[in-house]
Amino acid sequence: RQGETYILDRNGYCEELSQSSRRLHMLTGKSPLPLFRAPGGRLSPSLELAAKSCGYRHVGWAAAGFLGDELPSEKFSNAMLLDKALRGIRSGDILMAHLGIWSRRDPWAPAVLEPLIVGLKQKGFCFKTLKDHPQLGIEQAF
């Protein structure tokens, strides 16, 4: 779809979200939570309203939770990304990593994921799924 322009109304948004949900169900055998992330995290008011009308809720991630694993390692070393994450992540932040990106000359996940988890636990953090996230209140909302 790159380079294409298309306009979706409420029904179109709902169908796109439902299509993704059906695909995840097909792949996993489990019904996914009614959550989505807008492409690039860019959520318009009309998309948010449309999604709510068909039972979906937008979930983004915190700026500190953007772990930078897709950035070039020549400019952003693993040590730099780990330090930035450990300094910036706050309670309730949603973290995101592209664990399948191996284009970095120095791959991120093998070097950073375990020290990040250990470092956050040492700071008193615990880890929850989106279903159990206290600020999202998924159980109450759905």
Model-derived features with residue positions:
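C-terminal domain-boundary segment and adjacent tail
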Residues: 104-142
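Charged helix-capping and loop-helix junction motifs
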Residues: 76-81, 109-113
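Metal-dependent polysaccharide deacetylase catalytic core of the NodB/CE4 family, i.e.
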Residues: 1-77, 83-102
